[in-house]
Amino acid sequence: MGQKVNPHGLRVGVINDWDSRWYAEADFADNLVEDYNIRTYLKKKLYSAGVAKIEIERASDKLKVIIHTAKPGVVIGKGGAEIEKLKVEITQYTTKKLNLEIKEIKKPDVCAQLVAESIAAQLENRISFRRAMKSTMSRTMRSGAKGIKTAVSGRLGGADMARTEFYSEGTIPLQTLRADIDYGFAEADTTFGKLGVKAWIYHGEVLPTKGNKKEGSDK
């Protein structure tokens, strides 16, 4: 089952933390829809900024949104103009007091979501899927990853029948829970239809001990 399940979801509570951190009883459904709407809006609005992950924390009447991006300057804007616009636009989805935090991704080449989006962008620019996958994978390995696997599905090269192509370098221990595996998914809109792109990146092992928390985790 290690090959079928989302690698991040499989490791939540072991070496990964939740992307949404809050507790609710009566308002659970409303909060869930609110989170979905905020994430969908931000992902669409900031697509060019290379947003890899959006974390949401709630506490009584406060809402904290943490945006992990490869281009913080694009999100913040000149003199903070863009981030102020974002705050105003997000308030249409929530009535709570909003706190927006931007975190920079230092190495975008080893972030699975950004790698998948990079391959998808190349496919939209009519670059061969093999060339796009192999060049991106070699760049990721040079940046310090211990392993990478990519998959592209759809009408590859305009073929009449859809298929899936996999390429991998290094090791990807999907069923090892202590293995820190990042996962990303993106879609490419081409003249032949949509292509799905998946990326798995292995960063090494993390020992889940009480005193040793993974970087970026609030546990």
From Swiss-Prot:
Keyword Protein biosynthesis carried by entry: no
Domain KH type-2 stretches: 38-106
CDD domains, alphabetized: KH-II_30S_S3
Example GO molecular function: mRNA binding
Gene Ontology CC: cytosolic small ribosomal subunit
Pfam families named in the record: KH_2, Ribosomal_S3_C
Superkingdom of source: Bacteria
InterPro entries to which the protein is assigned, alphabetical: KH_dom, KH_dom-like_a/b, KH_dom_type_2, KH_sf_prok-type, Ribosomal_S3_C_sf, Ribosomal_uS3_bac-typ, Ribosomal_uS3_C, Ribosomal_uS3_CS
GO biological process: translation
Subunit annotation: Part of the 30S ribosomal subunit. Forms a tight complex with proteins S10 and S14.
Family, similarity comment: Belongs to the universal ribosomal protein uS3 family.
Function: Binds the lower part of the 30S subunit head. Binds mRNA in the 70S ribosome, positioning it for translation.
Identification of the protein by name: Small ribosomal subunit protein uS3
Organism: Lachnoclostridium phytofermentans (strain ATCC 700394 / DSM 18823 / ISDg)
